[in-house]
Amino acid sequence: MGKKKKKRKSSAFKIILNVFLSIFLVAGVAFGGIVFAMIKTAPPLNVQQVLTFDEPSILYDDKGQYMDKVITNEQRIVVDYKNVPQNLKNAFVSIEDERFYKHHGVDIKRFTGVILINVTNKIKRSSKLQGASTLTQQLIKNTVLSSEVSIKRKVQEMYLSIQLEKELSKDEILGAYMNSIFLGGNALGVEAASKQYFNKSVKDLSLIECAFIAGVPQSPSVYYPYSSASKKNPSIYLNRTKTVLYKMLDNGYITQNDYNKALKDLDSKKLVFAKPSAPSNKLAYEWFSIPAIEQVKKDLKTQYKYDDKQIHNLLVNGGLKVYTTMNKNLQDKTQNTINNAYYLNSYKSNGMIYPQASAVIMDYHNGEVKTIIGGRGDQPARSYNRAASYNYLRPAGSSIKPLTVYSAAIDSKKATAATGFEDSPIPNNIGRKYSSGAPYNPKNSPDIYYGYVNVREALMRSINVVAVKLVDKIGLNTSIQYAEKFGIPIDQHDRSSIASLSLGELHKGTNPLIMAQAYGVFGNNGTYTEAKLYTKVVDRTGKVLLEPKTNTKKVLSPEAAFITYDMLQGPVSESGTGPQANFGNMEVRGKTGTSSDMKNLWFCGLTPYYSAAVWIGNDNSSTVDGVYSSTAARLWGDIMKEFHVNLPYKQVQKPASVVTANVDRISGKLPTQLSYRDPRGSTVYNEFFINGTIPTEYDDIHVEAQINKLTGKLASKFTPSFLVESRVFLRRDYSPGVELLDQQWLLPYSIDEGGSLPPTEEKNNSNTRDKNKDKNKNKNKDKNPSQDKPNNNNNDNNSNNNNNNNDNNNNTKPPENDSNQNHEDNKNKQ
């Protein structure tokens, strides 16, 4: 019986043992299968991914110098392993992975010990759990895997760590770890942490500073020295630092003396942190960098079809190198010039300096923009970019005239530089075309009218009514077409507004970047070159992602471009509106602009090297006091002077197809003998023309008549012969209703002692000279209005014949005629 019982017990034990062994075997096989499945679904190990870190893109200037870095919420500065002090390397190994140089990716001894400790803590219901990740595992987690807490992720982490140890050396792994680890605040990597905490490079860290940084990864928020808890109780991070130092001593990385001195330094409060600062969200060269980044975004979307999220990630984390066209030296000088322009009559309001000013300078030959200044004085981050933003557009005033009026008329061959107009109030039959109510009747400012002028002089003096008459002649549609060719934003309101197209009273407006591109056409044979803000974008591997071509389009014929360029010397002449723009002996061309009520002041122009535009105004669109468009010309000249230092004199070359001819500056027609006998001197000069546009008719404004030289009246049969004198006059067959400055040179209507008028004038017998002088009698104001009667006047700015200046015939020096320009504008030509 006893033996049978023993046999039964033994048999039962074997059965139970076999069952348990079977269970364990099945469980082991199952567990192994699960682990194998987890490993099989692990992502492939990409060593390059491990060694590549998220970095913001960097912008460089046109000389390859560092300029700006794309702003991110976190800062990383990748540092070379050889520049990391040995103390910091040893500190990380001591506190994070003391058997780092012995294991092959996974520390089995530590892993087993941690499991036992964590199981014990669970049984005791303790919340204290320990981690067993090696530095290699942490690197895999930071660069390849997500931060998900799961058995699957842990198994994959261990597997990939073992694989990584086969591919990289220990130094490469440790170096990658120190560049990838989060170290509190905004710091990713040891270099960013060193800058954040101690305002120094990592290579300059002391032993206690190294120990502090190595202690942070365990709990970055707890050991953050700028937190309120740490400020109240510094022992939180000091004790952690001492623990790191002890581990370094225990592992033989520092001596007992080093350890003792380090503790003494900590107790003596020698662990000093830099003053905390909020992360800046302002770029160093914000005016230029933001438009450049926007252009890169646009091109990435066009070329690679990336969506906005992909583009954002690439710029923020992709470590791109963006080589811009900005010249840092000239950008700094231009900013300084605008900030310190004492003649801007500056004042402060709500901490901001006013008036504000902006400028753009570009090489119109290749489109490279060299300077963008979006404002003056201290500005908050992402402030108005008054130079380049399409959200900050302002009316251009008369600076639009060369674009939508004069070059448009010449290029379309509907007028020439010599075409004559009468500077006099707009006739009602024209005014009614552009107004449903009272006739449109813009005025010169102040109320001065020159009488007969040609197109060249009208541009020089910026005469408003002539610009309106010329747009009426070429048609709104033609003017609109050229505005769009030049890149001027035109909306539906502008399309039906002659004020927008002839006087620059645009509904939305323009900005200096738009105007600098447009004015470059005149020096570039009529070719518009699109602004280019960068030349190349390279990814972190050195591959060129973007290399934009120079985009151009034809706007004007070379002939029309050159003739307009030549005409633009008028506004910067002493008789023009902006002579202050001149500097040195450089060839300068340009045009002032003033919008209504002196709210926006402009100067746009070019040299044979660069085109540039300057704007002055207030952000609230209020009147700018004590500053004029001539001030904008002065600022333009001061800026451009710096751009042309050591550049040789140069000229824009005249196309061979541009022809010249002698014409009468009063009528714009071929001269007669009377043209040489104008009472103010010869009105014959040599003008540029597009071939085929030289006038064929002869001057009909000058007339000759015999007068009584004593009374100035027309001679008659009653006039004594010794008082009869033959003189040359100007004819005007109607009364303009206002006094014109050339009125004193008109053919007299009064007859000496009775008699009859010359036969050609009999039709105007009712219009006597005395009636013309009476400003209060305007019965004949709209009788026979002369819309496009060929006229002319002084043209001292023509490059081929600058004689016969008529300015000396009047004591009153005429002011600029920008829309509502204050008469004081001309008093400020300093």
Curated annotation (Swiss-Prot):
The chain crosses the membrane at residues 19-39. Pfam families: Transgly, Transpeptidase. The active site is at E96, S398. Cell wall formation. Synthesis of cross-linked peptidoglycan from the lipid intermediates. The enzyme has a penicillin-insensitive transglycosylase N-terminal domain (formation of linear glycan strands) and a penicillin-sensitive transpeptidase C-terminal domain (cross-linking of the peptide subunits). Residues 357-641 are annotated as: Transpeptidase. It comes from the Bacteria. Its main location: membrane. Residues 40-830 are extracellular. The keyword Secreted does not apply. Its EC number is 2.4.99.28, 3.4.16.4. GO terms for biological process: cell wall organization; peptidoglycan biosynthetic process; proteolysis; regulation of cell shape; response to antibiotic. Pathway: Cell wall biogenesis; peptidoglycan biosynthesis. One of its GO terms (cellular component) is plasma membrane. The gene is pbpA. It catalyses: [GlcNAc-(1->4)-Mur2Ac(oyl-L-Ala-gamma-D-Glu-L-Lys-D-Ala-D-Ala)](n)-di-trans,octa-cis-undecaprenyl diphosphate + beta-D-GlcNAc-(1->4)-Mur2Ac(oyl-L-Ala-gamma-D-Glu-L-Lys-D-Ala-D-Ala)-di-trans,octa-cis-undecaprenyl diphosphate = [GlcNAc-(1->4)-Mur2Ac(oyl-L-Ala-gamma-D-Glu-L-Lys-D-Ala-D-Ala)](n+1)-di-trans,octa-cis-undecaprenyl diphosphate + di-trans,octa-cis-undecaprenyl diphosphate + H(+); Preferential cleavage: (Ac)2-L-Lys-D-Ala-|-D-Ala. Also transpeptidation of peptidyl-alanyl moieties that are N-acyl substituents of D-alanine. This is Penicillin-binding protein 1A. Keywords: Antibiotic resistance, Carboxypeptidase, Cell membrane, Cell shape, Cell wall biogenesis/degradation, Glycosyltransferase, Hydrolase, Membrane, Multifunctional enzyme, Peptidoglycan synthesis, Protease, Signal-anchor, Transferase, Transmembrane, Transmembrane helix. Residues 1-18 are cytoplasmic. The keyword Hydrolase applies.
